[in-house]
């Protein structure tokens, strides 16, 4: 079943129909390319769980990169059509605690980190990026939110 689901995900990506769940439920407070942003910033609370948006493997865990604080990069086995031949990766920045290690397999929806405070005037937030080679606008790939 799992292999079938992964195959279906790759087929959806090839058709340009892939959509991710949100890594956290907060409001978008900075959009792609706004003030040099290569992703989006999502508001939240310190310690809030940050979840992987797709199955993948942790490619990098780091800290002290300007604009990211502690962050995680997850590599996924899908490629988006019309983009670079490089693998799709997602970046989760401004965390207070990282819960995964390099080369660890993660599942869609798994908590991989906890939200932190980036010492900005906007309070607790996370940076979320989608890359396949160059950065892509995450809003094009996140599931539409349901209105209350």
Regions found by a protein language model. Name each.
Residues 1-69, 136:
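Surface-exposed, glycine-biased beta-strand/turn segments
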Residues 72, 102-148:
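Conserved, short, structured surface segments that act as functional micro-motifs
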Residues 54-96, 129:
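Zn2+-dependent peptidoglycan hydrolase active-site motif and core
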Residues 31-33, 45, 77, 95, ...:
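Generic beta-structure capping elements
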Residues 43-44, 92, 97-100:
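Short alpha-helix capping/helix-loop boundary micro-motifs
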Residues 21-22, 49-52, 91, 99, ...:
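Residue-level "contact hotspot" at macromolecular interaction interfaces
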